[in-house]
A protein has these predicted regions:
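Beta1/beta-strand and adjacent pyrophosphate-binding region of the FAD-binding site
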Residues: 1-15, 31
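Short beta-strand/turn micro-motifs composed of small residues
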Residues: 11, 34, 98
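Anionic group-transfer/hydrolysis microenvironments
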Residues: 8, 36, 54
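C-terminal lid/capping helical subdomain adjacent to the catalytic/cofactor pocket in oxidative enzymes
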Residues: 2-5, 26, 121
C-alpha cells in the first residue's frame, strides 16, 4: 500500500506538532518524523514546558507574545474540551532578575515596551512580600548546600 502525504515534517516536538496541527486543520495529510522515541525528550522538557515572551531577538519576542494569546485560549484553539485537564494552561507569571550578567534586562525591557508586552518591575521588598521563600540576596541557580 502506497502512503502519500501532503507534507512531511521533520520533528514532532512543540514546533513540529504545531505545524502538523495547523496543516491538518486545513485538510493536509501530514507525517511527522522525529529522532526521539516519544514526547518529552526535546527542548520543552528542559524548560519545564513554561511559555515566556522574553527572548534575545525582537522577532522571538513578537512571535512568543502572539503565541501567548493562543495559550490563554488553549481549548478554544484546539477546538477540543479536555475533560481530563491535560490540555490546561495555568498562567503563573515569570520572574527574571535584573543583574549585571544580563545587562539589567535592558534589551528585554526595551522589546517589551516596543511590543507593548505588559510586565511589572518588583523591588526586593515587593518580591519578599509576594514570595517569602525567595532569597533576594543571591541570584544564582539553585544548588545543594554541599556544592
Amino acid at each position: 500500500m502506497e502512503k502519500k502525504f501532503d507534507a512531511i515534517i521533520i520533528g514532532s516536538g512543540v514546533i513540529g506538532a504545531a505545524i502538523s496541527f495547523e496543516l491538518a486543520k486545513k485538510g493536509w495529510k501530514t507525517l511527522n518524523i522525529d529522532k526521539h522515541p516519544t514526547s518529552g525528550f526535546g527542548s520543552t522538557s528542559a524548560s519545564c514546558a513554561i511559555i515566556r515572551v522574553h527572548y534575545s531577538t525582537f522577532d522571538g519576542c513578537a512571535l512568543a507574545y502572539e503565541g501567548y494569546h493562543y495559550w490563554k485560549k488553549w481549548e478554544e484553539y484546539l477546538e477540543y474540551k479536555d475533560e481530563s485537564g491535560l490540555a490546561l494552561f495555568i498562567e503563573c507569571g515569570c520572574m527574571i532578575y535584573q543583574t549585571h550578567e544580563n545587562d539589567y534586562l535592558k534589551n528585554i525591557i526595551a522589546r517589551a515596551n516596543e511590543l507593548q508586552i505588559p510586565f511589572e518591575k518588583w523591588d526586593p521588598k515587593l518580591i519578599k512580600s509576594k514570595l517569602p521563600i525567595v532569597d533576594t540576596r543571591q541570584f544564582g541557580p539553585v544548588k545543594l548546600t554541599s556544592d
